[in-house]
Amino acid sequence: MMGAEKAEGMEELELEEGGGSPSPSPMTAAGKMQALDFEHIGSLAAVAESLSTGSKWRRALTSVRVVILQAKINVLLPFGPLAVMLHYLSANHQGWVFLFSLIGITPLAERLGYATEQLALYTGPTIGGLLNATFGNATEMIISLYALKNGMIRVVQQSLLGSILSNMLLVLGCAFFAGGLVHPSRDQVFNKASAVVNSGLLLMAVLGLMFPAVLHFTHSEVQYGKSEVSLSRFSSCIMLVAYASYLFFQLKSQRSLYSPIGEQEEEVTEDEEEEKEITQGEAICWLFVLTIWISILSGYLVDAIQGASESLNMPVAFISVILLPIVGNAAEHASAIMFAMKDKLDITLGVAIGSSTQISMFVIPFCVVIGWIMGQQMDLNFQLFETATLFITVLVVAFMLQEGTSNYFKGLMLILCYLIVAASFFVHVDPDSSNNK
């Protein structure tokens, strides 16, 4: 037995010396470890990819919840598809198509303002100002472009005019009234210097609208029907340059002029550091989606204006000046009242008067230039009745703002002025209404 064990030991020794040992070599072990590492890394990559995909889906669902489900006003969203269905099911219900489209656009306009604010949180003040100038009145601009494409020039003029009147009288009046009721023991204060600058721009806009109207109705044109269009196009280019200069003045050159006064500065700084509820890419995607959906509904809305006027027994001027701007200004209306109740009148003025300035100095001239490109005779001749209404409104609001204070009585006066304007357009017969049929 001992001899056999020795023989086996000698054989194992010979195998090891001859290189035929079945034990693993160092190279083979390293290869196995490398393969194991690659498998481990591959499994980690797969897990990471799976987690990333799941995270993207969760992020998308969160974005939908924040933008669509979180706002209570979005209960009105189904009215949009109902308007589209009703348009194709029956041609005899244009009044309902108009009303449903009007209601359906309201939450979209509010959410468009929200997406713009979220995107502005990721940009600097200059780009943020340009975003507000572009998307702040995007609803009015889209409706106007659709009407302009269909040759409904008076609808374009009246809807933009109505948006200015609504912001200056109804939105600002409700904000002053609500703020005064919440703070009844004292007058609320705001930055008078910025209000004076905006009032000057609004008076410049009135100047640009007044001369084509006066030129037309005094029959003092060099070429009847052509000179006012040429003057309007030239004035529109000048107004666009003036608005661009205003943006530079506000955002770069004289930023201190627009800083809040008193104790509002610290509060506004805290509010400006609000949470970024959606990412920059999501904000851009939502801007695109909401703009497309507003564009679709705007087409049905514009097509139904004439039929709605006949079925509802309302003048087209009243629909264009009063009803359409209320939808476009839904976001401004809510935010202006909210900031006034929080005693932040500078933000309220930036929303209400700033929006009026954007429309008068940017949107209206922009529509004239676009109409020029389209071959439409869009001009700044808003007729004497509309131009006089705008002129008186600007004067009233300028007097209200000259002291730099507000209270509930000033707000009440502005609201009552708007009711008078609304009643005036309800009984007003547009001399050019036949052009829009």
Swiss-Prot record:
InterPro entries: CaH_exchang, CAX-like, NaCa_Exmemb, NCX_ion-bd_dom_sf. It comes from the Eukaryota. Residues 136-171, 328-363 are annotated as: Cation selection. Residues 1-29 are annotated as: Disordered. Belongs to the Ca(2+):cation antiporter (CaCA) (TC 2.A.19) family. Cation/proton exchanger (CAX) subfamily. Vacuolar cation/proton exchanger (CAX). Translocates Ca(2+) and other metal ions into vacuoles using the proton gradient formed by H(+)-ATPase and H(+)-pyrophosphatase. This is Vacuolar cation/proton exchanger 2. The chain crosses the membrane at residues 66-86, 89-109, 127-147, 162-182, 195-215, 229-249, 282-302, 311-331, 353-373, 380-400, 409-429.
